[in-house]
Amino acid sequence: MTPCTRVLLSATALSVLLGSYSAAAPRGVELRVLSSRADMVTGGAALVEADAPAGKFNATLNGEDVTKSFRPGKTPGTLIARVEGLKAGKNILEIKSVKGSAKLELVDYPITGPVFSGPHQKPFVCQTEQAGLGAPLDEECTAKTVVTYVYKSTDPPPAGGRGRGAAPGALPAGFKAFDPSAARPADLAQTTTSDGKTVAYIVRRERGTINRAIYEITMLHNPSDPAPDPWTASRNWNGRLVYSFGGGCAAGYRQGLPGGALTDDFLSKGYAVAVSSLNVFGNNCDDVISSETMMMVKAHFINEYGAPVHTIGTGGSGGAIQQYMMAQNYPGLLDGLMPQISFPDNAIYESVIDCSLLDHAFGSTKASWNDDQKAAVSGYATWKTCSDGWMSRGTATSLANNQVKAVACNAAIPKTLAFDPASNPSGARCDYFDDMVNVYGKDSKTGAARRALDNVGVQYGLKAFNSKQINFDQFLELNQVIGGHDVNGEIIATRDAADPAALKIAYQSGRVDTGGGSLNIVPILDTRGYFDMAGNLHDRFRSMVTRARLTAANGTADNQVTLMFPPTGTAPVRPGEQLAMMNQWLDNIAKDTSNASAASKVAHDKPAGLTDACWTQEGEKIVEPLTYDGKGRCNQLYPAHADAAIAAGAPLTDDILKCALKPVNAKDYSQPLTPDQVAQLKTAFPQGVCDYNRPGIAQQRVDGVWHRY
């Protein structure tokens, strides 16, 4: 990691991170950027706000007059300008009046990026044609911006609606193309927004490219009304923006396709929706690129439509990871988080890789194992969680392979560009760490990215052994054969040993969620269905891991509410209802004029009735605080489990990438050991075993925010 800058954050500083203020002016004139930070403007344009000068004033950009760009803003006493034509690098915006003067430096970057994520990943495969945007205009995968309209039909959608096999760009079930020049269709639906307005369900759909990603922005808008801009918002928009993040985890080297922005639950209530292909972890699992892309798309949104009252994140699995990591590492981009089936961060790779190692080891031991014993060692409710092809190495691009195997490239990457140890050793390496090479840097010996991957001293199956679910011979042999990975991600006999620099980078740069940044002051509504028994990695205890980390970092997790749904059937609280709760929570905070701290406000201003809860299969709501091993009906209905690290003694925070070691000691085991057995364990663990009563090696809280690479 080579961060050029980092910002140390306080609650006060957060409020101005995305509204970059000028130096204090002697007579009260002030300039600020609404669309982004002043030092991270993109695409040659920025939306700026000034206190309205008394009488005449003059505004210049790099010495050129831009006074006419300023027009009255929504807030009394302010002027807003969309300042365009910025040159790459530093620009000076200045405003003068009899009231005083103010000067603001704007630093502009190309709309193709990068801004803070480091050098662009190469090779990079364009996919604009697959997205229906035509051939790319340049090597940065640029496409022309396209604006079209669609509408919601009152006709019943076809059976099945739009399935997974639908063509890219196909409209979701119930939506049809709308021709503004034609007569209104007879099946045009009406909808009532959160503001109580009943309007025609017509959606403006903008698609284009930003930061080499394909983006889409949608909102209710009648095309017979004036085109929306920062001074004339669509009268059907409720002023809020929902940013949707997609799941998965893959190494990138391609543009990818975005998730859908035609989300009925959100659009029907008047919310604007934004998505981008590089905010889908299945296209690229680099959370820094995700944050950068989101920042740039949001800046474009503000330049075109005006600043939203709130920006709310939503998305499941990898989409949840992006929200949590963005709130920690790039605070100010999201005002509220709505993660579903969440994980706290990308360090989930440890759980995934442990599964593949265990799956391999169980097939390599002389001892026999039944599935209950395997499950006990893994920590999960069922061994199916690990043996599933997505978690093991059953498919070439399974999640396990995507984490460590350099050859696990997406099919969109031509074989001539992809890494092959024999035929193309200089090709694109498609594991997680090489995807994040701008953050971790390269190992000078191998040329591959440094890895924060380690299982030295981990006693796999420790709790299962202590509880007599497995015997000593099984415990010993498993830990003798568990192994690790070579530089290309192939399983070898030697355990993984993390690069010391990579460990430090992982914690300091925020690749591990440590509850920093804005994670103590943003509202979090964490929802999930109960999938533990289905053999699904998205299990219940992940929300508890995040709760434990927030509590460890901040002394409380009062800004997080968790809702637990039954494993089957329709969720008792629909996404639109969840969004309404989040919006009310944010509205309450905005109206709170007390002198309380931001952390106190977010805890105090929850909507009435919004609290930890679960629902029975029959639909009964049970209000109970989230606990890992406590009593209560929710834990009886939906027991929480663990992963292999916790089953080996790691804490619930599950945030130790490399454990501190201690000597093997017979007193640490519940089953009695003979001197020969102790000697065998010492041979199996020559460096010692994990001491989880101590912090991990290099473990620390995130060091500042808004890192550049």
What are these language model-derived features?
Residues M1-L9:
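Bacterial N-terminal signal peptides that target proteins for export
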Residues S10-G19:
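Bacterial N-terminal signal peptides
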Residues A25-Y709:
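C-terminal His-loop and adjacent cap/lid subdomain of alpha/beta-hydrolase
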